[in-house]
Amino acid sequence: PRRTPECAQIGCLHPCQRLTAKKGKWVEGVRETAMSTQETVRQQAGSVEASEALRLEQEKVEQLVEALNTDLAATYVLYHQLKKHHWNVEGAEFLGIHEYLGEAAEDAEEAADELAERVQALGGVPLARGAELEAAAPVEPEDDDVYDVRTSLANDMEMYGDIIEMTREHFELATNLGDHATADLLRDTLLDLEEHAHHLEHYLEDDTLVLESA
């Protein structure tokens, strides 16, 4: 049907326009326009585009992003191992260790989030896929078997120690490159890592109030 002169004068909608307007698309006559749904890649994985706002040289940013993505990968491997032990811990001291490992895993997840956000702020792309994270991590995760509590905690402390050494190196790198914000982030991360490693060391001491018969 055609739009009548009366409709044109009072601005009413042609039936086609009314039908299309309900779908959120306005047309002129029978011509319809729609928002493009074409997929766009804003930045390729592995690329670094130094932030103009932060004013750090491209070469320095590339080193920082590589280091932080390595930290990110290691932290996620640690997170998953802590969660594994949180789920599977048993024994007389179950509750306390179960709760502690849950808190440690939450701290690791929070640290990973902060590392990823710093990578993005610098102009990099944070690692996100599980396979990429595990491949980039300099620490070896425990296998899927369930071990006794002491072995599990010893493995966690070993991983914390490896990540502590790496974080110290990356703290020095950030400091030497003049990125004091990243250095401060890594310093705070290092303090948390050392606190958890020290806590695990206490759990693994021989002294206990629990009788062997328990």
Cite the ranges covered by each PLM segment.
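Disorder-to-helix initiation segments
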Residues: E49-D71, D145, V149
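Helix-loop segments that flank and shape redox-cofactor active sites
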Residues: R55-Q63, V77-E103, M166-A181
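Conserved alpha-helical segments that form or flank metal/cofactor-binding pockets of metalloenzymes
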Residues: K83, V89-E132, Y203
